[in-house]
């Protein structure tokens, strides 16, 4: 439990690093790999919108670049009550999350909700469908 609260605290701390001059909506994501490594990401907006990088894909891409593929926690926090991943991020998470990966949507260390990728993206298309 302390480990989870520390991850939530970290996400809240880095949220202001987001580059969001157009929406003014700051999102942060902290992921913990099964090996215990922690990676961070924030949303980075772009004037043409489509190249905007969401916090979730930012954090996961950094971890993947460092050779990590298995995740214990994906913690997301934003400027609203509870900030859920967009559809693109849910599909991106689907590629690397398994049924044991906890996806935490947090307002603060006391107010958060825990999900699996199957909760957030039921009936999804995944790499298993291509086997």
Spans of model-derived segments:
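Short beta-strand scaffold segments in enzyme catalytic cores
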Residues: 24-33
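Compact, glycine-rich, soluble single-domain proteins
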Residues: 43-57
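Hydrophobic "anchor" residues
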Residues: 37-38
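Short, well-ordered amphipathic alpha-helical segments that serve as non-catalytic structural scaffolds
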Residues: 10-13, 55-62
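Alpha-helix C-terminal capping segments
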Residues: 32, 62-68, 96
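Histidine- and/or cysteine-centered catalytic micro-motif in compact active-site loops
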Residues: 32-34, 43-44
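C-terminal binding/interaction regions
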Residues: 2-17, 68-131
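Short Gly/Pro-enriched turn/cap motifs at secondary-structure boundaries
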Residues: 19-22
């Amino acid at each position: 439990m302390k480990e989870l609260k520390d991850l939530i605290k970290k996400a809240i701390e880095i949220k202001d690093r987001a580059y969001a001059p157009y929406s003014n909506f700051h999102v942060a994501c902290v992921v913990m790999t099964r090996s215990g490594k922690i990676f961070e990401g924030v949303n980075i907006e772009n004037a043409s919108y489509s190249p905007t990088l969401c916090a979730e894909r930012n954090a996961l891409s950094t971890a993947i670049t460092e050779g990590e593929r298995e995740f214990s926690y994906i913690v997301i926090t934003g400027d609203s009550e509870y900030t859920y991943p967009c559809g693109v991020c849910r599909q991106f998470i689907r590629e690397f999350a398994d049924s044991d990966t906890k996806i935490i949507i947090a307002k603060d260390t006391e107010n958060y909700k825990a999900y699996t990728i199957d909760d957030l993206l039921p009936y999804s298309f995944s790499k298993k469908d291509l086997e």
